[in-house]
């Protein structure tokens, strides 16, 4: 790689670190091409990506913004999993690491915070952004539905009473 290509790669990584909800740093030593393709497919289904990065370029892209702890993540053969949703990449990477011994989660970055392996595992247990939005909408709609039911109940009872009087008068 010449200097211009390295600078372009650093700028691309800066964009990844800035635009991603969370970045999961992994070691992939020993994975076959088929296993990497399978992992990339699983990540893509969740809207995430996997990118093999050169450690020195990743450290320069971070530019000391997360300190020594962030630089320490980038040792050995490293791939980063990232997505706009902070949870999806962590979920897939953590699950894949459980299923495959050759793939390990080293840690992660979330904004300016460095996560260790346990932090990424904890992040993976959280519901995704879409699931949280669904729960919030459900919570907001539930009271309105109950209020509508309560308001309709007296009107229904009144209509039944009037119907009963009408039937009684007709008989």
Curated annotation (Swiss-Prot):
Pfam name, any one: Ribosomal_L10
Q: Does the keyword rRNA-binding apply?
A: yes
Cited InterPro entries = Ribosomal_uL10, Ribosomal_uL10-like_sf, Ribosomal_uL10_bac, Ribosomal_uL10_bac_type, Ribosomal_uL10_CS_bac
Q: Which GO terms describe its biological process?
A: translation
Q: Name one GO cellular component term.
A: large ribosomal subunit
Listed GO MF terms:
large ribosomal subunit rRNA binding; structural constituent of ribosome
Q: Describe its function.
A: Forms part of the ribosomal stalk, playing a central role in the interaction of the ribosome with GTP-bound translation factors.
Family (UniProt): Belongs to the universal ribosomal protein uL10 family.
**What is this protein's name?**
Large ribosomal subunit protein uL10
Q: Which organism is it from?
A: Phenylobacterium zucineum (strain HLK1)
